């Protein structure tokens, strides 16, 4: 019983939010899939910088679900931002109360951007507070670490691309 409780501590909390285009996303329904959850905001400059990397992950790995969870933006702001910055993955929004609860449930999101990778078992396997940038990888190794965790979680080689 104690072991089951410890195992369940690593499971990610459930939430349901909508994307600006009206599609609903529920974490429980995504169990069995690999999810990259990115907490961010339109006013956050480092968040904007990592959009090409997140677009790349979204387009390269068919079985990876990339979700941008805005901590403060409205549906209209996300729609405009998505078009302006050519964001390829879903951008989710909620009330400040919903976002605060999700942030705390996920261990406290104290900086944006923060990326969390969730494996097929619904467990966090990677978390990083800061921008995941390919250009900084030679100094911080974050991009390559996340890429390795994605391919491990998906059970694919790095070259596995969407057709």
Predicted regions located by residue number:
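N-proximal helix/coil linker or "cap" segments that precede and/or mark the start of modular domains
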Residues: 1-14, 80
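A short beta-strand-turn-helix
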Residues: 14-35
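Active-site acidic short loop of glycosyltransferases
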Residues: 30-33, 63, 87-88
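Conserved redox-active cysteine motifs that mediate thiol-disulfide chemistry
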Residues: 31-32, 39-56
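Hydrophobic beta-strand anchors of alpha/beta hydrolase catalytic cores
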Residues: 36-37, 66, 115
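Non-globular targeting/processing and membrane-anchoring segments
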Residues: 149-163
